[in-house]
Swiss-Prot record:
This is DNA-directed RNA polymerase subunit omega. Belongs to the RNA polymerase subunit omega family. Keywords: DNA-directed RNA polymerase, Nucleotidyltransferase, Transcription, Transferase. The keyword Zinc does not apply. Its EC number is 2.7.7.6. The keyword Cytoplasm does not apply. It catalyses: RNA(n) + a ribonucleoside 5'-triphosphate = RNA(n+1) + diphosphate.
Length: 70
C-alpha cells in the first residue's frame, strides 16, 4: 500500500461522509482497536500501522458494503 493510495482512500472517506468529525473519530477508534489487537497477539505482525489499517478497512467497507456481515 503506497502513500498516494492511502491518501486517496482517506480523502474518499471524508468526501463521502456527512460529518467529517465523526469519520475522523471512527478512524481513530478503529485504529485504537487494531493497536490493542496487535498487543493481544490477535493479528500477525504487520508493517502497516494501525491508522493505515483502519483507513483501508473503513474504505473497503464504504466501497464494498456487501462485505459487511449480517
Amino acid at each position: 500500500m503506497n502513500s498516494n493510495d492511502l491518501a486517496k482512500r482517506g480523502e474518499s472517506l471524508i468526501r463521502h461522509s456527512t460529518n467529517r468529525y465523526l469519520t475522523t473519530v471512527r478512524i481513530a477508534f478503529r485504529a485504537k482497536q487494531r493497536r490493542f489487537d496487535d498487543f493481544d497477539g490477535l493479528l500477525e505482525e504487520s508493517t502497516v500501522k494501525p491508522v493505515q489499517r483502519a483507513i483501508i478497512e473503513l474504505s473497503d467497507e464504504q466501497d464494498q458494503p456487501d462485505l459487511l456481515p449480517g
